Amino acid sequence: MRTMNILLCIAITTGILSGLWGWVAVSLGLLSWAGFLGCTAYFACPQGGLKGLFISGCTLLSGVVWALVIMKGSALAPHVEILGYVMTGIVAFLMCVQAKHLLLSFVPGTFMGACATFAGQGDWKLVVPSLALGLLFGYAMKNSGLWLAARREKTQNITAVSE
């Protein structure tokens, strides 16, 4: 029952804050889909709390940098198509290897940052704030849901004791 309570509370806060994120993204001229990738990175990161927020942020940003390396590197010799493929393979390898460092240990976050950059056509000045604000929304979604679940459980325990 406790697991369902937590899931329901996270679903409620995620639903509310997702709607708010959509409005904020449009109001600020950000990429709403990239923000949802930021949210997803936090939810998917095995570490929670501020540590998970920081690790997710570092990996998302490293992914942005790696994508730019691929894009700029491939553009150096656009007539040599194979260069882009080789560069992508080498960079993907490095994206995984960097996970030996704690702050870069969430490999999916690195790939999410890279994918957002590719989808955003390399416009990192738009992609980075979209990912970052989305990441903060993801943190708020999950942690406000956990707070709501704890508060609800505490209220139920007080009610059960008083009966």
Which sequence ranges carry the predicted segments?
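Alpha-helical transmembrane segments and their membrane-interface boundaries
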Residues: 1-48, 123, 127-128, 137-149, ...
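Short, amphipathic, aromatic/basic-enriched membrane-interface segments that mark the entry/exit
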Residues: 1-7, 23-28, 50-58, 75-80, ...
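Interhelical loops and loop-helix junctions of multi-pass membrane transporters/channels
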Residues: 3, 7, 11, 79-82, ...
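Hydrophobic faces of alpha-helical transmembrane segments in multi-pass integral membrane proteins
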Residues: 9-21, 54, 58-70, 87-95, ...
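Structural signature of hydrophobic alpha-helical transmembrane segments
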Residues: 22-36, 71-89
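Membrane-interfacial segments
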Residues: 28-29, 74-82, 102-107, 144-156
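Pore- and pathway-forming membrane helices of multi-pass small-molecule/ion transporters and channels
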Residues: 30-47, 89-123
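Amphipathic alpha-helical interaction elements
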Residues: 45-46, 62, 78
